[in-house]
Structure formats: structure tokens, C-alpha cells
Amino acid sequence: MKKTSNAASPLIYKGDKPFKRIARTHQSDFRTNFLKVPFDPDNIYGKYGAFLMPNDANAGLNFCKDFRQEILDRIQKRYPRLTATQHDGLYANMLRSEHIPWNVFIPMAHDLSATAKVFNKILGADEIDEVTDIRIEWAPEKTKCLNDNTSFDTYIEYLHNGKTCGIGIEVKYTEEGYPFGAKERREVMENEQSRYAQVTKSCGWFITEISNRPIRETAL
């Protein structure tokens, strides 16, 4: 009989940075005290307490209870087949970011008026007249966006003065930054003629003093 534990894991992963250590402890406590399901102390990932066991993962316990079945149906439609690694990242690993868009934006899709208000507050302007669609794990046609393999964890489509606009969202479960890759640095910070530079300068969201400067001086 397989050994399991219903308690929070006492183990600390030595490779965790401060934020991830706090997040791992939080998720282990959430699994123990809210989901009330065990973890596998012998699993290479599960022994730290923030990784659901197969039956619990397949039941969708990584997803919001009130919208769980809808989320599972939408995931099945979006991903008819998942590799074992992809499945674990989305269904079992409570520290990955893959589940977050489904847990946040599926509920928001049930009240698009409230969603518009939330994003107008985030943007600090009455930019959004009406949210018309919320797409999760969506990739636009290359030539209509950044001319690469860019995909969005979530894409918010909305109307502004009768014009269709969009907000692309990348979701990360972290408070720490990610370094530029070689291609990203070249396209975002060095090539003034890149599609990234053109979109940045033409989007209208930067004041003139910034948008008129070389892209390498403005990229974060």
C-alpha cells in the first residue's frame, strides 16, 4: 500500500528563493487545510507538499471549485492530448503558473461588464467600452501580431470607440523577474525596426518623451 501523508510537508526545498519558498509552504497548507487531500512523500516533486496526487489532479482540484467542471471541459477542448509533463504542470503542480489563467479568467468571463471595470482601473483610463472575448492560451497569426511564435496566456478582446483592441497577458507565479533571452534582447532592446519596436512606439500607451527615445533605452 502506497504511503501518503495528510499533513503539510515539513521538507524545505533548498533551491527555493524566498518568494517560492513562501508560495510552496502556502500551497502545501492549502492542500492540507482546504482541499484536505494527502501528498506523496516519496514523489520527487510531491514530497514538498505542493503537488497533487494523480486521482486528485485528474479530479481537477488545482482549479476553482465553483467553475471546476467548466474549466476541465475548456481545457479538454483546448488540449485534446497532453504529454505527461504538460498534464502534471497544469493539473498537479500547484506552483506552476499554467492553472492561474483558467482560475482567474474563466470566472471573469461570466461578468464581462465587471471585467471591463477591473481592467479600466488597472489601465488607469476609460479605455475599455466593452469586453467582447476572453481567450486562454491563444496565439494570433504571426503577421498580425509580433511576427513570431508569441502566444498569450490570456487575451482580452475589447471595443474602444467602436474599434476592436486587445490586451495580451503573460501569467507567472512569481514576484521575481525573468532575464531576456538572446532573441528577445535583440528584438526588444536593439533592433529599432523590429515588430516589437514598431508596436511599442505605435500603441499610444507611452508619453512622447518615452516613445520618441530609442527602444533600447525604454525596454524593461
Language-model region placement:
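Nuclease-adjacent, charged terminal/linker segments that flank catalytic cores
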Residues: 1-144
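"Short basic amphipathic alpha-helical interaction patches in structured regions
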Residues: 118-122, 170-172, 181-187
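Short, solvent-exposed loop/turn segments at secondary-structure junctions
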Residues: 139-143, 161, 172-176
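Acidic, metal/cofactor-coordinating or nucleic-acid-engaging core segments within structured domains
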Residues: 177-220
